[in-house]
Amino acid sequence: MMSHQQVQINLILMQGIWTSVLKMQNHSTLLQLGSSSTMPQRPRLLS
């Protein structure tokens, strides 16, 4: 039986790079989306 984990997604601007932060119960993952110079607008997260 699978247990449902709570996943929290945050979007931050880190050193000029849009970064998506996935926080789970035991760990967090950083996904670099692209630089703010090529993406001046805040990226939208579609759920």
Curated annotation (Swiss-Prot):
Record bears the keyword Nuclease: no
One Pfam match: Bunya_NS-S
Any GO BP: viral process
- Does this entry carry the keyword Electron transport? no
Keyword set for this entry?
Eukaryotic host gene expression shutoff by virus, Eukaryotic host transcription shutoff by virus, Host gene expression shutoff by virus, Host-virus interaction, Inhibition of eukaryotic host transcription initiation by virus
InterPro entries registered for this protein in UniProt: Bunya_NSs
Function in brief: Inhibits host transcriptional machinery, by producing modifications to the phosphorylation state of the C-terminal domain (CTD) of RNA polymerase II. Inhibits phosphorylation at serine 2 in the heptapeptide repeat (YSPTSPS) of the CTD of RNA polymerase II, suggesting that the elongation step of transcription and/or 3'-end processing is prevented. Inhibition of host transcription machinery leads to shut off of host cell protein synthesis and inhibition of the host innate immune response. NSs also seems to be involved in the nuclear relocalization of host PABP1.
The family assignment reads: Belongs to the orthobunyavirus NS-S protein family.
What is the protein's name according to its record? Non-structural protein NS-S
Q: Which organism is it from?
A: Bunyavirus La Crosse (isolate Aedes triseriatus/United States/L74/1974)
Taxonomic lineage = Viruses, Riboviria, Orthornavirae, Negarnaviricota, Polyploviricotina
Q: Which gene encodes it?
A: N
